[in-house]
């Protein structure tokens, strides 16, 4: 129950509006993930592709704040949502597994055997390092999927992706 109360502020972050004037780029630029397709006007004076003082010309571009989907009209970036959700799931699952192991150690749960007849306690436990590597692998797969999706959107809207060669007509 205590862990649930600690996660409530994280949930609050999901519904907060993102300050459009405070961040000139999406959240993954803040943490160094380069997934954002380049945006608004190719000859714009701003290096990010948006007008410095006016985001009105950027409403339909992937490269500008405010394009990304939100909850209840408040803007949220998908990578931030995935990161927070994954972190919450990891914390909650860790607490549940810890409680379950404590009950098993006290003998409150019946012993479970696998189909091979081997007792479940005889199976090797998975280390924390292995679990972290598996989670990082899943997050990497999610980011690759998001990047592919963004590249597909960019090619549909004729927007050049940073780092990719320009597409000729």
Swiss-Prot record:
Q: Which InterPro entries match?
A: TMEM89 (IPR028069)
Gene Ontology cellular component annotations, sorted alphabetically: membrane
The stretches that face the Extracellular side, renumbered to this chain, are 23-75
Query: Where does the record say this protein resides?
Result: Membrane
Organism listed in the record: Mus musculus
- Write the record's keywords in alphabetical order, separated by commas: Membrane, Signal, Transmembrane, Transmembrane helix
Kinase keyword on record: no
Q: Where are the transmembrane segments?
A: 76-96
Signal peptide start and end residues = 1-22
Q: What is this protein called?
A: Transmembrane protein 89
Q: What ranges are annotated Cytoplasmic (topological domains)? A: 97-169
Membrane topology, record value = Single-pass type I membrane protein
């Amino acid at each position: 129950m205590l862990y649930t109360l600690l996660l409530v502020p994280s949930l609050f972050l999901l519904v907060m509006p993102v300050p459009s004037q405070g961040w000139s780029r999406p959240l993954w630029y803040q943490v160094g993930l380069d997934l954002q397709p380049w945006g608004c006007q190719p000859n714009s004076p701003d290096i990010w592709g948006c007008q410095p003082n006016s985001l009105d010309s950027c409403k339909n571009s992937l490269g500008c704040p405010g394009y990304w989907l939100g909850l209840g009209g408040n803007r949220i970036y998908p990578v931030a949502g995935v990161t927070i959700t994954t972190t919450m799931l990891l914390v909650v699952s860790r607490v549940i597994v810890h409680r379950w192991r404590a009950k098993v150690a006290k003998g409150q749960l019946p012993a479970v055997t696998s189909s091979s007849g081997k007792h479940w306690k005889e199976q090797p436990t998975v280390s924390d390092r292995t679990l972290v590597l598996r989670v990082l692998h899943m997050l990497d797969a999610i980011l690759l999927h998001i990047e592919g999706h963004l590249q597909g959107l960019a090619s549909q809207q004729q927007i050049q992706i940073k780092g990719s060669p320009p597409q000729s007509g």
